[in-house]
C-alpha cells in the first residue's frame, strides 16, 4: 500500500517495474556511479567508459543486467533503458539491446540503433510468448545485455562515454 495525496493505493506487481538486482561488465569500466543509480529516471547516471585501446574502432562497452519478474508468466514484458553518449557526434556509437531467451539459452537482439547524445529512453517490447525471457525454474530471473560499439567514425576518432540513467523491466501480469 502506498499513500499519495491523502489517498491509499494498493499496488500490484503489474504496477511495479522490475529493478536491477545485478550487473556484470563484460567489457569497459565503471567510471562513476553504479547499478544503484539505475532504478529511476532521475538524472543520476552510472558512467560507463570503454577500456582505452590503441585502435579507437575496438572501443566497446558490454554490460549484462539482471532483475526479477513479478510473475513467471507475464502477459507482456518490456525493457527500458535511458542513456546518452558523451564525447562525440551523434550517430557514431551504436547501442544494441539483447534479452536472454531461457528456452534457447541464448540472447535475442531486440534493438540496434545509434545512441543519442541527450538522455533518451528506449523501450523494447518482444513479441510472441514473452515467458521465454523469464527463468521458469523458481527464480523468475530476467537478463538483458546492452552493448555500445563504434563501427566507424564520421569524423576523427574520439573518446566517448555512456551515461545510463535508468534500466527497468516494466511488465504487465
Which role does the model predict for each range below?
Residues 46-71, 125:
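Short beta-strands within extracellular/lumenal beta-sheet-rich domains
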